[in-house]
């Protein structure tokens, strides 16, 4: 692993763990608080520029979403749900994407962190920016989907396009990054690359032949994988695909969605990656030395989510962490071993060498059809995209110390 030192900004809002999708719902925003508690108790915060994100406004969110949809998210509450019943159907808000107390505020924290991360890169304040509360890749222009309401990733990509000619989006969540792909399916300014389970599995999209349309033809890359993929198999596809994208697309900035539902033993996942295999992806993307945003995403076995995102925070900051977890507020979650590790299991790998070689070859052949490093003069850069009252707030070291045990 490459533990080289870089300037890293880390976004965290202490309120993020207060939001609840519901007692039986697998999405637990509390996991981001667990990560932060480990970051603090490993003393990692000393190596990071810790920033409380400026919360995204409705105007910020409507850069990607319709006014009507964002207005609905702003207005709907558990107490007013019945009045908004027709809107809930229209905007796909219900079971998977429930109405809960503070829904709009949760979205504004998630989106604000990712937009702020892009602004840190644009300003040169950071080489890497982290927002584990982001990564909500299923959200669409006018509807919620797959536990996601506002597409913070698309908002961050738009912000990056102000200063970077080409942006690469990489997704290692077990689910296809359909929402982000849809936003940029017709442009050559953003390339999307998703590694995901394909077949009878949510959201059911991401076929290898789905490569974009019009100007965006060949700028969407889909890597459809089968159940049980392990570290070695994943690496054998990930590294050549990303290397060829870097060579042919030549991105100037990259967003990496680090969904942890691709880990072994995830409550909703079907892959068999260890912490080592998952973090290999982070390390490999980091090695290209591009301005880089890392966001969260899926991950439903929360003790493993916290372990891996903490380890990857250390990796991004150039700090190797002790395998023995420090004492922290959530120590009981990590028994019986109390280690900073997630191991693969004995799950069968349905990805044969022949299958992996065939999809890798097809993807690389598609990339060869790209005109080398697209000319940006042909396509207008989006207008200025700034926060209202966009003053970032650095957390004082004393405040962080309050979280230490």
Swiss-Prot record:
Subcellular location: Nucleus
Record-level GO BP terms: epigenetic regulation of gene expression; heterochromatin formation; transcription initiation-coupled chromatin remodeling
SUPFAM superfamilies in alphabetical order: Arginase/deacetylase
Keyword Lyase: no
CDD domains per record: RPD3-like (cd10004)
Keyword terms of this UniProt record: Chromatin regulator, Hydrolase, Nucleus, Repressor, Transcription, Transcription regulation
Residues annotated as catalytic: 138
Enzyme Commission numbers on file: 3.5.1.98
GO CC list: chromatin; cytosol; nucleus; Rpd3L complex; Rpd3L-Expanded complex; Rpd3S complex
Region: Histone deacetylase, residue numbers: 6-318
Entry GO MF terms: histone deacetylase activity; histone H3K14 deacetylase activity, hydrolytic mechanism; histone H3K9 deacetylase activity, hydrolytic mechanism; histone H4K12 deacetylase activity, hydrolytic mechanism; histone H4K16 deacetylase activity, hydrolytic mechanism; histone H4K5 deacetylase activity, hydrolytic mechanism; histone H4K8 deacetylase activity, hydrolytic mechanism; protein lysine deacetylase activity
Principal localisation: nucleus
UniProt catalytic activity: N(6)-acetyl-L-lysyl-[histone] + H2O = L-lysyl-[histone] + acetate
Similarity field: Belongs to the histone deacetylase family. HD type 1 subfamily.
Function: Responsible for the deacetylation of lysine residues on the N-terminal part of the core histones (H2A, H2B, H3 and H4). Histone deacetylation gives a tag for epigenetic repression and plays an important role in transcriptional regulation, cell cycle progression and developmental events. Histone deacetylases act via the formation of large multiprotein complexes. Has a role in chromatin assembly and chromosome segregation.
Subunit structure: Heterotetramer of alp13, clr6, prw1 and pst2.
Name the record gives this protein: Histone deacetylase clr6
Annotated source species: Schizosaccharomyces pombe (strain 972 / ATCC 24843)
Gene: clr6
């Amino acid at each position: 692993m490459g533990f080289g030192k870089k300037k890293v900004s880390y976004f965290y809002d202490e309120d993020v763990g207060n939001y609840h999708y519901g007692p039986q719902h697998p999405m637990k925003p509390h996991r981001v608080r667990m990560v932060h508690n480990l970051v603090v108790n490993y003393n990692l915060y000393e190596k990071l520029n810790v920033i409380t994100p400026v919360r995204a406004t409705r105007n910020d969110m409507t850069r990607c979403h319709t006014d009507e949809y964002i207005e609905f998210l702003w207005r709907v509450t558990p107490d007013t749900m019945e009045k908004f019943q027709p809107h809930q159907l229209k905007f796909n808000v219900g079971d998977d994407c429930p109405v809960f107390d503070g829904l709009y505020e949760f979205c504004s924290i998630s989106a604000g962190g990712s937009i702020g991360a892009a602004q840190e890169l644009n300003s040169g304040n950071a080489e890497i920016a982290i927002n584990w509360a982001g990564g909500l890749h299923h959200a669409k222009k006018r509807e919620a989907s797959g536990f996601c309401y506002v597409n913070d990733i698309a908002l961050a990509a738009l912000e990056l396009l102000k200063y970077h000619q080409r942006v690469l989006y990489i997704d290692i969540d077990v689910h296809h990054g359909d929402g982000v792909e849809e936003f940029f399916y017709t442009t050559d300014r953003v390339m999307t690359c998703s590694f995901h389970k394909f077949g009878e599995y949510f959201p059911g999209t991401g076929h290898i032949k789905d490569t974009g349309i019009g100007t965006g033809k060949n700028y969407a890359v889909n890597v459809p994988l089968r159940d049980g993929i392990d570290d070695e198999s994943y690496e054998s596809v990930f590294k050549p695909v990303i290397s060829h994208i870097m060579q042919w697309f030549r991105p100037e900035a990259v967003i990496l969605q680090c969904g942890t539902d691709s880990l072994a033993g995830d409550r909703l996942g079907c892959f068999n990656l260890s912490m080592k295999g998952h973090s290999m992806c982070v390390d490999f993307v980091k090695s290209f030395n591009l301005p880089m945003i890392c966001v969260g995403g899926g991950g439903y076995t929360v003790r493993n989510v916290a372990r891996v995102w903490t380890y990857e925070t250390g990796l991004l900051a150039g700090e190797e962490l002790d395998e023995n977890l420090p004492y922290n507020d959530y120590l009981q979650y990590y028994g019986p071993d109390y280690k900073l590790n997630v191991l693969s299991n004995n799950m069968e790998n349905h990805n044969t060498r022949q299958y992996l070689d065939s999809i890798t070859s097809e993807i690389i052949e598609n990339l060869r059809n790209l005109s080398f490093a697209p000319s940006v003069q042909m396509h207008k850069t989006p207008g200025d995209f700034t926060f209202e009252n966009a003053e970032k707030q650095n957390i004082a070291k004393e405040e962080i110390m309050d979280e230490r045990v």
